[in-house]
């Protein structure tokens, strides 16, 4: 039986493999969630560069958040990354949820990014 860490890595790789088949050159909106914070990056895999990023640890958000581990914080991070991505000239992305299910904080971040102007 695979360890928890191996199972998470296998699940994340499976999701990323599916994304690469449908990406068509679009950047990847990669999300990582920890127990206390949430992090998101817009990554151009062809160039190997990060185009925009945001997290609950950003100075723009840190003062206004009670905690980085709730759906309200995830929604603020989603809006912030959408704003930064549009400044960088990115409108369309593919959503990389990694090994996390599309529920709760991940879903709140995705919906806020869509409202902020990103399409996926």
Swiss-Prot record:
Any one Gene Ontology molecular-function term assigned to this protein's record: 5S rRNA binding
Keyword Cytoplasm: no
GO cellular component: cytosolic large ribosomal subunit
Keyword Cell membrane: no
Pfam families: Ribosomal_L18p (PF00861)
GO BP annotations listed: translation
Keywords: Ribonucleoprotein, Ribosomal protein, RNA-binding, rRNA-binding
Family: Belongs to the universal ribosomal protein uL18 family.
Primary role: This is one of the proteins that bind and probably mediate the attachment of the 5S RNA into the large ribosomal subunit, where it forms part of the central protuberance.
PANTHER family documented for this protein: 39S RIBOSOMAL PROTEIN L18, MITOCHONDRIAL, LARGE RIBOSOMAL SUBUNIT PROTEIN UL18M
Protein name: Large ribosomal subunit protein uL18
Gene designation per UniProt: rplR
